[in-house]
Amino acid sequence: MRQIIIAGNWKMNASKEATNTLVIGILSGMADVKSKVIVCVPSLYMSQVEVLVVDSQLNLGAQNLNVNKLGAFTGEISADMIKDFGAKYVIVGHSERRSLYGETDEIVAQKVQVALDNNLTPLFCIGELLEDRESNNTKSVVSKQIQVVIDRVGIEAFKNIIVAYEPVWAIGTNVTATPQQAQDTHAFIRSMLAEYDADIAQITSILYGGSMNSRNAAELLNCKDIDGGLIGGASLKAQDFLQICKAG
């Protein structure tokens, strides 16, 4: 039985004060949450959140990492730096990193490998553009993104990878894939993994990352192959986020 995982991606939001308020607000409602909950916060606030979540069931994650251990990479953050703040998770290959910063499937696969090599669990993001879906290319796009990672790290590595399917056309748009559309793609992802190893496919968590919110979370999480959510905007309000966390 796969545990529901809810991961909040704050993106480039919050302030020092807002971070404190938001984390305390989330912690105050965690007593009856059965899901695994992760908050992926801006790197500047990781030390602040590390202190707030100590000895709690709230897990800390980062939003990106550089493939290099250290060096002249201005503005970047390494796996060692992430671990220094007690984080165990890192988002890799988010659609915004792919589209705005030119991260290719190969770069994403390299980041997945670096995360794994450093005992960080990657939240490996995949997904298609609107034109891909309209031209019936969702499966080919998603399968290529997965294949490049399998070729680099092997199917066994998926024991320690969380997959996040994010239909790019449904991110930050208030347009959500129907539960059936989401389930169909999640089922396809699992079937692709099963072609390599059926047991690993069954234990791999596949999160939905397309504008899940407190209104649609329960229906989405009720789908057979949807194991949680990668939450953007709704993770910035404690009560909305908690409602999603409790929906599973």
From Swiss-Prot:
Superkingdom of the source species: Bacteria
PROSITE patterns assigned: TIM_1, TIM_2
Keyword field contains Endoplasmic reticulum: no
Residue sites binding substrate per the record: N9, W10, K11, G172, S211, G232, G233
A Pfam family assignment: TIM
CDD domains: TIM
GO function terms (MF aspect): triose-phosphate isomerase activity
Top-level enzyme category: isomerase
Pathway: Carbohydrate biosynthesis; gluconeogenesis; Carbohydrate degradation; glycolysis; D-glyceraldehyde 3-phosphate from glycerone phosphate: step 1/1
Main location: cytoplasm
InterPro entries: Aldolase_TIM, TIM_sf, TrioseP_Isoase_bac/euk, Triosephosphate_isomerase, Triosephosphate_isomerase_AS
Catalytic reaction(s) noted: D-glyceraldehyde 3-phosphate = dihydroxyacetone phosphate
Cellular-component GO terms for this entry: cytosol
Keywords recorded for this protein, A-Z: Cytoplasm, Gluconeogenesis, Glycolysis, Isomerase
Places the protein is found: Cytoplasm
Active-site residues annotated for this sequence: H94 (electrophile), E166 (proton acceptor)
Enzyme Commission code(s) on record: 5.3.1.1
Family: Belongs to the triosephosphate isomerase family.
Subunit and interaction comment: Homodimer.
Protein's UniProt name: Triosephosphate isomerase
